[in-house]
């Protein structure tokens, strides 16, 4: 059964992508970061999210693969993305389809 966790900026699936399709997997997690392009991402910041994801997944090694645990990982990644925004490592995409400033109003500097 396909398990998933979806937050505003993070989607995690127990699946792998093949031919633009999600194929269920018990061995692979797929991470989709900021699917609505709410933020401007530099490669360094995006790699930090991937590294944090790997770290969080490793911390659950040996535990049940459940929607609850996936939600915990997704929630932790949401907080991590907020910290990147607060540190100025990412910024809001002012050309995004919707501007809702879900992580707080932008800082004018």
UniProtKB/Swiss-Prot annotation:
Keywords: Membrane, NAD, NADP, Plastoquinone, Quinone, Thylakoid, Translocase, Transport. It is a peripheral membrane protein. The keyword Membrane applies. GO terms for cellular component: plasma membrane-derived thylakoid membrane. It is found in: Cellular thylakoid membrane. Its EC number is 7.1.1.-. It is an enzyme of class 7 (translocase). It catalyses: a plastoquinone + NADH + (n+1) H(+)(in) = a plastoquinol + NAD(+) + n H(+)(out); a plastoquinone + NADPH + (n+1) H(+)(in) = a plastoquinol + NADP(+) + n H(+)(out). GO terms for molecular function: oxidoreductase activity, acting on NAD(P)H, quinone or similar compound as acceptor; quinone binding. Belongs to the complex I NdhM subunit family. NDH-1 can be composed of about 15 different subunits; different subcomplexes with different compositions have been identified which probably have different functions. HAMAP family: NDH1_NDH1M. NDH-1 shuttles electrons from an unknown electron donor, via FMN and iron-sulfur (Fe-S) centers, to quinones in the respiratory and/or the photosynthetic chain. The immediate electron acceptor for the enzyme in this species is believed to be plastoquinone. Couples the redox reaction to proton translocation, and thus conserves the redox energy in a proton gradient. Cyanobacterial NDH-1 also plays a role in inorganic carbon-concentration. This is NAD(P)H-quinone oxidoreductase subunit M. The lineage of its organism: Bacteria, Bacillati, Cyanobacteriota, Cyanophyceae, Oscillatoriophycideae.
């Amino acid at each position: 059964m396909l398990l998933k966790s979806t937050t505003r900026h993070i989607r995690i699936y127990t699946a792998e992508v093949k031919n633009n399709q999600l194929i269920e997997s018990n061995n692979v997690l797929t991470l989709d970061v900021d699917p609505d392009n709410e933020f401007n991402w530099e490669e360094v910041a995006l790699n930090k999210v991937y590294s944090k994801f790997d770290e969080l997944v490793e911390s659950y090694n040996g535990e049940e693969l459940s929607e609850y645990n996936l939600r915990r990982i997704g929630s932790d990644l949401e907080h991590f993305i907020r910290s990147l925004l607060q540190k100025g490592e990412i910024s809001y995409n002012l050309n995004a389809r919707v501007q809702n400033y879900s992580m707080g109003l932008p800082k004018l500097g």
